[in-house]
Every structure is written in C-alpha cells, then in structure tokens.
Amino acid sequence: MGSSHHHHHHSQDPNSMSQPFASRGLAWFQALAGSLAPRPGDPASLRVADAELDGYPVRFLAVVPDPDNPFPRARQGEVGLLEGWGLAAAVDEALEADREAPRKRALLAIVDVPSQAYGRREEALGIHQALAGAVDAYARARLAGHPLIGLLVGKAMSGAFLAHGYQANRLIALHDPGVMVHAMGKAAAARITLRSVEELEALAAKVPPMAYDIDSYASLGLLWRTLPVETVEVPSTADLVRVRTCLGEALADILGGPRDLGGRLGAANREASARVRRLLREQW
C-alpha cells in the first residue's frame, strides 16, 4: 500500500524526470539508435529501436534503469521479469516480421546490466523462465539467420548477460574499467567463496575465469574485439565513428560466415576446450 502512494508522489515530483540514473546503456543506445523514448507497450526499462548500419537493417535493444519500475529489485538496470519477457517479445517480433525476408535484420544488444533481479516476487513469478525466454528468443533468431551482435558498454553480470547479449555471434567490449563481465558480483562471490573481496581479487589475478576486468575476459576468447573509447559515459563523435565502424565490420564478418558460436574457440585460454573437443571427435 505504501509503495503505491510513494509511486503516485514520485510521478508528481518535478525532479524525478530530470535526474534519471546515469546509464551508459541508455547513452549508447541513444547515440547509436538515435532514439530515446520507450516504445508504446514496452516497459520503461526496455529500449528497442529499428535503424540501419551500413545500409543493413538493425534492431537495437537495451535494458536501462527505471526508477519507477513496479519491481523494486529491477530499478537499476537489472534484467527482471518485465525485462526478460520484454526482450523475448521484441526479438520474437523481429523474427516473425522477417520470416520471409531475404535479409534478416541484425539484433544489436547494448549491454549494461548489473545483474538479474533478485527478489521473492521474482522467484515466485519465475525469473528463471523470463530469462530463459529471452535466451531462447535470441538463440532462435540467431539460428534463423539474424546476425546477433553484443556491445558491452558497462557491466555484463550473471543471468542478466546470459539473457541479453551472450547469445551474440560477435561480442565487442569497450575497453574501460567500468566494463566488467562476471558470473556474479564481487561481494556475492566473496561471500560464497568465504573470502574477502581483496582476497578474491588477488586470486582472480591468477585465475582468468574468476577475474572481472575486460582484459582477463578477452583472454578467454569470447570477445571478438575490445575498443578503446575517449568518453565512455557519453560517447564522443570519434567514439561513435570507431564503434559504428567496428559494428559494421562485425556485421560483415557474421554475414560472411557460419552462424554458430565456433569463433569463440580460437583464443589462447581456450586451447584446452578446443583440444577436448577434437579428442572427443576422434574417439567417437
């Protein structure tokens, strides 16, 4: 009851609109897709826009903070119930619309997601199904021939990243300390491994899959490219040119090759994975 009253009050607050959460995801979405407002019918935490990249049709998708999100645990850009199902619907819509089209539009996930939404309501209403719905839609689109590109501009954490971005044929990350990829946030990981955050960081320096920084992640071979930028919070003109060029190259690269995720097994830290796969093939 108290929350609905607060919500009503919030909408009357003249400052609430002028002070949104600072969101890299929204800044890059606006710069690349040229649009700002949510589409009618989409949750305010979801941004979807159709545009072009080098003359090829592209649907841009981003999950952004919404301080008025009806689910309090999804107010800071987390992927929750509305966001998971919203992404699934937006991807499915493109899949259906392009079913007969010779050129399937590219899906470009702009990734800045701190985590999935953790809460009792989320658990009760099936957050795992909402996230799985998004993963499934992206995977089906990729297999149907839609080029998928993930652009990491901020955090790419846990189930949120799996639901939005991870299914991409090509992952591109901005080279910046604020761009972090991990299975879970540092504080949670420290709790679960019974270490302090400092101990965890020391350990991560020796074990690349445990690290958070983008260079360690790049060594695992999942990133197609990392890009330096001048002003990561609000992209400069030079940043935009560089990122657009790279996205165009990624698109051309996808359109010219197979649509599976085999490209990830080329990197140094993935040699063991590639060797295991080869040995398995030889033995079977």
Name each model-derived stretch.
Residues 2-5, 12-40, 190, 194-284:
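Amphipathic alpha-helical segments at domain termini/boundaries
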Residues 39-57:
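N-terminal short beta-loop-beta anion/metal-coordinating cradle
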Residues 54-84:
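STAS-typified acidic loop motif
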Residues 60-62, 109, 150:
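Structural beta-sheet core signal
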Residues 70-74, 118-123:
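Short acidic, glycine/proline-rich loop/turn micro-motifs
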Residues 85-118:
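A structural preference for short, pocket-lining loop segments at secondary-structure junctions
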